[in-house]
C-alpha cells in the first residue's frame, strides 16, 4: 500500500466561512473558493452567483478578506478552528469581469491581500497550499503580478506554496503556450470539467493525464469537476486523476473506501506535495 496515488477531494464552491468545516467534516481535504473582483481589480467577495450547480445555493458569500481570515484559522496549527486535513485551496478567480489589461494589477492586489490576511505577513499564517485558477489564458499576466508583488513585499519564498491552473477547458497545447508566456514551469494543476447537471466525456482528462505522465509534459496534477455520483467518481479514478471536485465529499470518500480503489488510492495529507507528479 506504500505506492498509492494521493487524491485531493475538493469541496466545490466553498464561499462562506461556515462551509469550510462543513465540507472538511464530510471528507474534503481541499476546497475550491470563488473570488469576484471589483472594477479596480481588487478581489472583493468569495461569491459564485447564478447560475451554479444544481442543488446548491449560488449566493453564499463573504467579504474576501474576511474569508481569508477564516481560512487562516482553519489552516493554522494550534488555532481552535484548525482542520488538520485541509491542505489545499483552489481559488477560482472570476476574472471575466476584468479587462485583459487589468490582469497584472489583479495579481498584485491578490498577492497583497493573501500576504496580509492569509499568510499573516509571513508570520505563522495559514499553511495550506494555494492554487490560483484562472479561466482565461489571456489573463496569464496575473501570475507575474502576483509573483512580483510577493517579491516586492519581501516574501518570494511563499511562491513555494502557490500552484497554477487554467480552468477554461482550452486545448492542452494552448495552455502550455500560456505558461511559457507567463514563465511558469512546475506547480501546474490542470482542471477539466463542467457543471454537475451536464454530462462530459473524459477525452480531455485523458489528454491531460497523458501530458502529465509523458517525459516532456508540463502538467503535474489533473483534477476533474464537478463529480457528484459514484459512477463518475470511479470513471475519474480509473482515468488516473489526482483530484476530484465535488459537492458531496462523502460520495468520493465512499468510493475511495471500496476494496478496488483502496488498494490504489489514498486521501492526500499535508506531507503530499501537490506540485510533485506522482510516479506509478
From Swiss-Prot:
<feature type="active site" description="Nucleophile">
    <location>
        <position position="48"/>
    </location>
</feature>
<feature type="binding site">
    <location>
        <position position="92"/>
    </location>
    <ligand>
        <name>Mg(2+)</name>
    </ligand>
</feature>
<feature type="disulfide bond">
    <location>
        <begin position="52"/>
        <end position="58"/>
    </location>
</feature>
<dbReference type="GO" id="GO:0016829">
    <property type="term" value="F:lyase activity"/>
</dbReference>
<keyword id="KW-0354">Hemolysis</keyword>
<keyword id="KW-1015">Disulfide bond</keyword>
<dbReference type="GO" id="GO:0046872">
    <property type="term" value="F:metal ion binding"/>
</dbReference>
<dbReference type="GO" id="GO:0005576">
    <property type="term" value="C:extracellular region"/>
</dbReference>
<dbReference type="InterPro" id="IPR017946">
    <property type="entry name" value="PLC-like_Pdiesterase_TIM-brl"/>
</dbReference>
<dbReference type="Pfam" id="PF13653">
    <property type="entry name" value="GDPD_2"/>
</dbReference>
<keyword id="KW-1061">Dermonecrotic toxin</keyword>
<keyword id="KW-0443">Lipid metabolism</keyword>
<feature type="binding site">
    <location>
        <position position="34"/>
    </location>
    <ligand>
        <name>Mg(2+)</name>
    </ligand>
</feature>
<dbReference type="GO" id="GO:0031640">
    <property type="term" value="P:killing of cells of another organism"/>
</dbReference>
<keyword id="KW-0479">Metal-binding</keyword>
<comment type="similarity">
    <text>Belongs to the arthropod phospholipase D family. Class I subfamily.</text>
</comment>
<feature type="active site">
    <location>
        <position position="12"/>
    </location>
</feature>
<dbReference type="GO" id="GO:0008081">
    <property type="term" value="F:phosphoric diester hydrolase activity"/>
</dbReference>
<keyword id="KW-0800">Toxin</keyword>
<feature type="binding site">
    <location>
        <position position="32"/>
    </location>
    <ligand>
        <name>Mg(2+)</name>
    </ligand>
</feature>
<keyword id="KW-0442">Lipid degradation</keyword>
<dbReference type="GO" id="GO:0090729">
    <property type="term" value="F:toxin activity"/>
</dbReference>
<keyword id="KW-0964">Secreted</keyword>
<comment type="function">
    <text>Dermonecrotic toxins cleave the phosphodiester linkage between the phosphate and headgroup of certain phospholipids (sphingolipid and lysolipid substrates), forming an alcohol (often choline) and a cyclic phosphate. This toxin acts on sphingomyelin (SM). It may also act on ceramide phosphoethanolamine (CPE), lysophosphatidylcholine (LPC) and lysophosphatidylethanolamine (LPE), but not on lysophosphatidylserine (LPS), and lysophosphatidylglycerol (LPG). It acts by transphosphatidylation, releasing exclusively cyclic phosphate products as second products.</text>
</comment>
<keyword id="KW-0456">Lyase</keyword>
<keyword id="KW-0204">Cytolysis</keyword>
<protein>
    <recommendedName>
        <fullName>Dermonecrotic toxin LgSicTox-alphaIA1</fullName>
        <ecNumber>4.6.1.-</ecNumber>
    </recommendedName>
</protein>
<dbReference type="GO" id="GO:0016042">
    <property type="term" value="P:lipid catabolic process"/>
</dbReference>
<keyword id="KW-0460">Magnesium</keyword>
